[in-house]
Amino acid sequence: MRAHDAIPSPSRAAQDSAVQGYNEVRRSAPELVKAFEECFHAWQVTWDRPTHSSQAATRCDVDEFDKLVEMGPEILPLVVYKLLDSRNFTGVFLYNALETDERYLVDPSDVLNFLVLQRQNNLIIEINLGRQW
């Protein structure tokens, strides 16, 4: 991928896998999903607050983000599902804060993919294709 190439969407299979992961958690832990949805929405609301920085990472310097991180890696399938909506690209920071398995992280040394959040967003969905949660 070159610098000005369009950012490709995740494959249909990866998108379907993200939906399946969300649905599995919704069936097995509906209260977790409810709590996650409430916390994620509260965090989304903070994204529109004025900040003193143009850096997207500043959206993580809020209590709402910390509450999501405290929920632990059990919410990873829910985060991947949220990344299907490109408006939720800030969720990349939440995913990276929760994921501990390097096989499912976008390589930070791959600067083009790591620094472009939308690209990282789509790669996260893709690398989780078929993952057993």
Q: What do these predicted regions represent?
A:
Residues 1-133:
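Extended repeat-based scaffolds of very large eukaryotic assembly and lipid-transport proteins
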